[in-house]
Amino acid sequence: YIISGLQLWLLRDAGQVVPYLSPEREGVLKPFKDEAGYWAGVYFNLEVIGVNTKLTQPRDMPKRWEDLLDPKWKGRMALENEEIPWFASLQQIMGEERAIDFSRRLAKQQLQMRSGHTLISQLLAAGEVALTPTLRVNIAETLKIKGAPVEWAAIEPVAPNAPVSLGLAKNAPHPNSARLFIDFVLSREGQTVVRELNRNPTRGDVEQPVPRATKVKLFEMHWDGVVKNYARYVKDFNDIFGVGAGEK
């Protein structure tokens, strides 16, 4: 399997994934693998604060999450309407009580709740919003190369999204071939291919496609807790931000 980490962990819990401790896992950064060998990350998305530089000044760039509560941002921000992993990460970084309080206050800032990171990045580049708290770094840099008035900054530590991950299927028809494939994807050579596709590799010895992002301090998420409490995170996010995130 190569799928979203959250989906892979559900398959693991259902007994559909078996451990495989690939020798290449050694090079994978700790936040992107489990100790038992059920999964390892192929690539991850790093979400940061993104601003439109025509609508803001460098001094306006938020340095703390609470800076988003400044009245100057009211009605000028957009948030993806299924940002459950981001919502969960705030609770692990800040603590549940502080994060819930922050989220409720943020919701009063008249956010534009939109569907899709690509759409939000386009709105940001076009100046329809001044800021988004979850702009993906690779999208931001692509926009900058094209001349869009976009800049980003990280509020550290940054919790990477659940990585797109791979694991060995319990009933794989050719398990040895699957193991060799896993070895390649997690190897330095395989992760270099990932980098060339403008994705963030999970190995520590492969430079990120955006060198500046390599210096960002990462937060080690406890994703098992997110998976087990996902329904609660969805409900709380929906209640606070007034959307139907995660409902399928």
Model-derived features: positions:
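A structural signal for short loop-to-beta-strand junctions that line the ligand-binding cleft
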Residues: 3, 17-49, 66, 76-77
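Periplasmic-binding protein-like
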Residues: 27-31, 45, 73-82, 103-107, 111-114, 184-207, ...
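Flexible hinge/capping segments at coil-to-helix
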Residues: 58-72
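Ligand-binding pocket segment of bilobal, Venus flytrap-like solute-binding proteins
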Residues: 9-10, 76-157
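An extracytoplasmic/periplasmic, membrane-proximal ligand-sensing/linker region
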Residues: 97-99, 202-248
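Pocket-flanking alpha-helical
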Residues: 1-17, 25-33, 121, 138-146
